Amino acid sequence: MARAQVTVPLDIPDVRVLKTEINKVGELIITIESTKEGTICRQCGREIRKRHGYEEWTTIRHLPVFGRPSYLRYRPRRYQCMECEGHPTTTQRLDWRESNSPHSLAYDDHLLLQLVNSTVEDVSIKEGAAYDCVLGVLERRISVSVDWGQYTALGVI
């Protein structure tokens, strides 16, 4: 008898799913590739499109699927700038992930929602994520200062 399958949209722009698998501990691993062409040169700021290989494989946490933790696995593309001296390479930045974050932006949003009326410790336990990972979401996504210059009036609730 064939195993039943369900298709779940990732809702991530500019990616193609290459493979899905469930590892030994029951986590869903989704191998993807970017379909976005080009990136911005880290030195001159121009758009560059000359491919120059790939970074190492990267695995980041994504939204849970049917109660299972899921991870996105991909190799970021590298591009070379032919205008700058030394022809430096730049890793493609993706709209759905912040640089150096262990999570997708969608998972960051999920964790922030879980933090409503909960502590960092509570969310860490519920999600099976390290305390520092949950704290990192707060530090990356929530501003600790207010730009009062953007407000002309404060209303009364």
Where are these regions (language model features)?
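Short, conserved DNA-binding cores of transcription-related domains
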Residues: 1-86, 91-94
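Short, positively charged, Gly/Tyr-enriched micro-motifs
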Residues: 59-157
